Amino acid sequence: MNQSVIDAVLRGRIPRKIGARRVRALRDSIDFVGLNYYNREFVAFDRHARQAFFGRRVQNPDGEISDKNYGEVYPRGLYRILRRLKRSGKPIYITENGLPDHDDDRRPAFLVNHLKQMWHAINENVPVMGYYHWTLTDNYEWAEGWNLRFGLVELDPKTQRRSLRRSGALYAEVCKANALDTDMVRRYAPELMETVFRG
């Protein structure tokens, strides 16, 4: 199913696995590709999990898991999917990328690592035209309520008071400079200095 929608809107072709047919009106019907990328998950077949399309989540024992077991933090996956989407021939916007991080301890490194992967893709002529972090402020999630904190800006649900987080300050600097530089990484994610800027 991974390529089914993109194949349909680019080529007007619905794959055999979901009922092969051609739909000419769909062919080349998009102006850009919007990518929402959050994490990596492994699944295994489970014949008892009908409601989950017979799949069961399997955790990577070596992976970094985000708050509330939201998924494995895997920045390289962003690069890999951007390279794959390059074949669409369309401009690409990363329309959502983020993780729940109640205390904003990991979000600065998450941002740095994902922006680095986006930069690698751009340097390989992947037409990435924009990046939107998920989210600007903490928001109410349908299944989780206020329990997952995704925002660059902390939101108190009772008072509606907003406070800029460290990750928000980092992202503001990145946007203003249209770059991620050594000073930003040193101040916001110093543990990544040697891996982000090698040599």
Tell me what each language-model feature is.
Residues 1-199:
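Active-site region of glycoside hydrolase catalytic domains
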